């Protein structure tokens, strides 16, 4: 295959990836977007193989790698629970970062295979590209592993605040920059692995102090990092498709991070600096009655059956209990009785961007019933019932009313303005941000303590009876 034709094929592949992003931007076109992405990737892989012209043994290794990776991917796709999707995304990001490190190492030890010079005579531009790629890749690798452990509950979701962490991070960053300069001048293997070691440490230290409330931003941020790492691999390999794809992923992840930060009324820098989610004080505890109104499934069934409009607000509690199908059944039962039902989604609900949308799509909830915060917030005042399922921090009135609250200014869903708020939660404990929710103590709120799926199922049964 000629290089000109390969460049054209890579361009077509890049266009397919752009169309994939376009398709994935809306639930109704998401399947089409996935198809575009798969076609684009197939074109890129076939073009690369035809351009490389591997030997028989090399081709056998490539096929074996594709079989192992494809088999593992197919197995994961079939077995993974939708509730574990944030962990899966973080895991995939770590693999991209690791790939960047390994490709950079291969290029350093065998530069002739990459067309970037000979050992001891690698082009300076290639060394700079290689260094940046390995630094970003290593940071992405360990940062994504920490995010995975936090999301999977294997590490505390609370911020781990190390003393002088900002000084340490700054020192590591300066050290990486200095070592990159040394590597370009010396091509030292030792310096290369020092860059890897410092970058791995920086990846851990950047994510460890970030609390669970900021996890959606962290996931999108790591998504951006993985994209730039892939672009770095593309420059090292001289692969146009990887450069295009990496730039697309990197820029889209950065934009998504900005949107997430805007949805939390926080700056991107404040998220990176970490620490949010460590507060344990009960916001507004001095001027509210601490008593709560407890209810049962029968109470909730009566209130919703006699309502004319119900807004369902899913949160991480729905994901943990895998209650999305039960919620869909409840909505169908309400609609049979002539009740208007809508779903309200907060942009940072759950543990990754679009987490709730994915779960509702799995339960085949009609897309025209799902609304974002800015589109539905004004309707809570006209709703008879707001049915909240574990959406804790994103419904906390302290963010709107209490200037002393750590989450003050974060846009929330105004569920407290509904005539009645039914809040399903396992306990009265604070949310992932570590802040008490003043919504629990309002006269219009009825707490339904228990597992979200069982409670919703019990409400459906009570309505049938």
Model-predicted segments: where are they?
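Structural signature of hydrophobic alpha-helical transmembrane segments
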Residues: 1-14, 51-71, 126-141, 187-198
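C-terminal ends of transmembrane helices
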Residues: 16-29, 70-89, 144-159, 202-215, ...
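Cytoplasmic-side transmembrane-helix entry/capping segments in multi-pass membrane proteins
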Residues: 31-40, 62-64, 84-96, 159-170, ...
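Transmembrane alpha-helix boundary signature
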Residues: 48-63, 75-84, 101-119, 186
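Transmembrane helix-loop junctions at the membrane interface of multipass transporters and ion channels
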Residues: 53, 106-120, 185-190, 217, ...
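Mobile "lid/hinge" segments at catalytic clefts and subdomain interfaces of large enzymes
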Residues: 211, 225-269
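Membrane-interfacial segments at transmembrane helix termini in multi-pass membrane proteins
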Residues: 248-307
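Structured cytosolic domains appended to multi-pass membrane proteins
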Residues: 288-465
């Amino acid at each position: 295959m000629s290089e000109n034709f390969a460049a054209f094929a890579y361009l077509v592949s890049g266009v397919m990836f752009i169309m994939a992003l376009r398709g994935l931007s809306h639930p109704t076109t998401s399947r089409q977007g996935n198809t575009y992405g798969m076609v684009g990737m197939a074109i890129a892989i076939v073009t690369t193989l035809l351009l490389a012209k591997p030997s028989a043994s090399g081709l056998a290794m490539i096929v074996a790698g594709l079989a192992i990776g494809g088999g593992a991917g197919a197995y994961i796709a079939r077995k993974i629970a939708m509730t574990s999707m944030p962990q899966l995304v973080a895991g995939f990001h770590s693999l991209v970062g690791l790939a960047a490190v390994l490709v950079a190492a291969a290029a350093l030890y065998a530069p002739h295979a990459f067309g970037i010079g000979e050992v001891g005579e690698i082009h300076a531009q290639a060394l700079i590209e290689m260094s940046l790629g390995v630094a970003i890749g290593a940071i992405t690798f360990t940062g994504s592993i920490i995010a995975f452990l936090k999301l999977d509950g294997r590490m505390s979701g609370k911020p781990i605040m190390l003393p002088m962490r900002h000084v340490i991070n700054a020192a590591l960053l300066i050290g990486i920059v200095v070592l990159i300069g040394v590597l370009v001048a010396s091509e030292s293997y030792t310096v290369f692995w020092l860059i890897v070691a410092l970058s791995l440490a920086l990846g851990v230290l950047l994510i460890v102090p970030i609390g669970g409330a900021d996890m959606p931003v962290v996931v999108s941020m790591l998504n951006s990092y993985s994209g730039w790492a892939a672009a770095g691999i593309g420059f090292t390999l001289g692969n146009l498709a990887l450069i295009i794809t990496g730039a697309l992923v990197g820029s889209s992840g950065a934009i998504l991070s900005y949107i997430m930060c805007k949805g939390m009324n926080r700056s991107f820098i404040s998220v990176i600096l970490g620490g949010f989610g460590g507060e344990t004080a009960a916001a507004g505890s001095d001027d509210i009655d601490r008593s709560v109104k407890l209810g049962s499934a029968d109470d909730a069934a009566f209130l919703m059956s006699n309502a004319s409009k119900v807004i369902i607000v899913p949160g991480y509690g729905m994901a943990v209990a895998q209650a999305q199908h039960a919620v869909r059944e409840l909505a169908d039962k309400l609609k049979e009785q002539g009740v208007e039902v809508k779903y309200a989604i907060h942009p940072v609900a759950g543990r990754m961007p679009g987490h709730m949308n994915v779960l509702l799509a799995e339960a085949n909830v009609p897309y025209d019933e799902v609304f974002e915060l800015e589109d539905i917030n004004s309707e809570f005042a006209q709703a008879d019932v707001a049915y909240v399922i574990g959406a804790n921090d994103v419904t906390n009135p302290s963010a709107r009313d209490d200037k002393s609250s750590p989450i003050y200014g974060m846009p929330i869903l105004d569920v407290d303005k509904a005539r009645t708020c039914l809040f399903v939660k396992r306990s009265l404990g604070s949310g992932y941000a570590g802040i008490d929710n003043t919504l629990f103590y309002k006269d219009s709120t009825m707490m339904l303590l228990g597992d979200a799926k069982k409670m919703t199922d019990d409400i459906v049964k009570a309505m049938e009876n």
